[in-house]
């Protein structure tokens, strides 16, 4: 990933985020933009750097995370997992909003993100603007509360730009 090809907001904020001070301060990072602009790549890069710096990091896609939470609830081991989740310095949740969730999944996601608010850091990658978070959280009140909590003192990184994959595909087609 060529940093110079990232959207301008990402180019400006990446040096700040790379210090990992946001983890020390319990701040969140929201990487928001269209597909193929490097959101997951940046999130994973920050996660790897955090691991190498001695932080405990958890990564999951939101759909798999919700499925895991539902399974843990059904086996009555959710509280044990929540205790472990609270100990991670950084949780990275990828693909927020790519797949909508049912009410139970939305409530579980809300509860488990709320536990961390203001204390531990979470990175979320999403292709949805905040006004569309209600599509994930089926309840508009829950969507508003989640947006309020997750964005409080957060770094918002606008990742809207041209898709790297599409750019590579066009290049490949020209060469073929």
Locate the predicted segments by residue.
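N-terminal pre-Walker A segment at the start of P-loop NTPase domains
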Residues: 1-20
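Non-DNA-binding regulatory cores of transcription-related proteins
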Residues: 20-21, 119
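Conserved hydrophobic/aromatic pocket- or pore-lining residues that grip, position, or stack substrates
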Residues: 1, 43, 61
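Conserved post-Walker A coupling segment in P-loop NTPases
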Residues: 26-30, 46-69
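Residue-level preference for the first positions of well-ordered beta-strands
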Residues: 28-30, 90, 121
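Walker A/P-loop nucleotide-binding motif
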Residues: 25-42
